[in-house]
């Protein structure tokens, strides 16, 4: 017998939360994935707009896309977590290490932003989402080490989930990276991922460094995953991601539970990055005290003044996770600020 891993209750609430968010922010499209952090099972996977063969107006070909596995997107700052993970795992930086986040140039390209100046530790770099800090961390890592760690996390690799039309994404390890490539990759430009790949990578952080095979079939036995990160690395990352939500992404908070995650906002590429269209991300883990689910929310091209991941994707994450944890019977944490 074949039993799907999809939990219809979580699937339904994810559909409703994503649909409401797409309408509220007048977005072109969106997707959400919920993974069981311990097994790699897909608990929910939803897309907007979604197809309905019974309604003529909802039969458009693009409505049948499973965006979570077919769409390859630059993840923006959500990738900074993986940059920090690589540096910690390979002993290049320690959690308490500081980095000069003052904007700097590579050739004619200025790397930096107005959020960061001076020496900051790794947690603060994630909280403030410092491009210059992430870039300098990345440039201290040898290319082969960076590629090897990211590949172990599933970046640039087919997840073999069983969903048709799955894209591989693009990491580009076959190239001889120039410094500008490695710098921009650190904050999620020049690399493309699917939502499912991003969820898989973060699941290693949630699962004490073990990467499991993604499955749409309900798993009967405990999976034998492969180690990508050490337990000490993931313990530090979980604390950092919780601090990100606590200090800079209040819309991602879930009442009664400790959660962690990272936003991402990336300009869409046409001929260049000069346009006004953006993709907004939030990738989160819950509960931080004993991780059980990893959730990725992507909102494509929201319209209006709100287009950052923390503004549009984070509240959708909060809505999905709030319901999912209760459906799964996961007890709330005590003394949690909401």
Where are these regions (language model features)?
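Beta-lactam-recognizing serine transpeptidase/beta-lactamase-like catalytic domain environment
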Residues: 6, 32-77, 82-303, 309, ...
């Amino acid at each position: 017998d074949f039993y799907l891993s999809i939990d219809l209750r979580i699937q339904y609430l994810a559909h409703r939360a994503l649909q409401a968010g797409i309408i509220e922010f007048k977005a072109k499209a969106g997707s959400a994935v919920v993974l069981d952090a311990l097994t790699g099972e897909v608990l929910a996977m939803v897309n907007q707009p979604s197809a309905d063969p019974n309604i003529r107006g909802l039969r458009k070909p693009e409505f049948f896309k499973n965006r979570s596995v077919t769409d390859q997107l630059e993840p923006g700052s959500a990738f900074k977590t993986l940059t920090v993970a690589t540096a910690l795992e390979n002993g290049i930086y320690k959690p308490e290490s500081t980095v000069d986040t003052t904007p700097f140039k590579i050739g004619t390209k200025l790397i930096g932003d107005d959020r960061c100046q001076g020496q900051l530790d790794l947690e603060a770099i994630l909280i403030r989402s410092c491009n210059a800090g992430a870039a300098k961390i990345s440039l201290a890592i040898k290319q082969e080490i960076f590629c090897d760690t990211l590949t172990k996390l599933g970046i640039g690799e087919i997840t073999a989930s069983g969903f048709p039309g799955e894209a591989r994404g693009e990491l580009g390890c076959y190239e001889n990276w120039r410094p500008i490539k490695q710098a921009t990759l650190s904050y999620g430009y020049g690399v493309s991922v699917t939502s499912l790949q991003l969820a898989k990578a973060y699941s290693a952080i949630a699962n004490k460094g073990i990467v499991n095979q993604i499955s749409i079939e309900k798993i009967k036995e405990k999976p034998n995953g492969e180690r990508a990160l050490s337990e000490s690395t993931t313990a530090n990352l979980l604390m950092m991601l919780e601090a990100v939500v606590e200090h800079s992404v209040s819309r991602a908070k879930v009442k009664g539970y400790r959660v962690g995650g990272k936003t991402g906002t990336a300009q869409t590429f046409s001929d260049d990055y000069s346009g006004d269209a953006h993709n907004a991300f939030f990738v989160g883990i819950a509960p931080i005290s004993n991780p059980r689910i990893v959730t990725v929310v992507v909102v494509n091209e929201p319209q209006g003044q709100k287009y950052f991941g923390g503004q549009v994707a984070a509240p959708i994450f909060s809505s999905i996770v709030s319901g999912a944890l209760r459906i799964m019977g996961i007890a709330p944490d005590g003394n949690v600020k909401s």
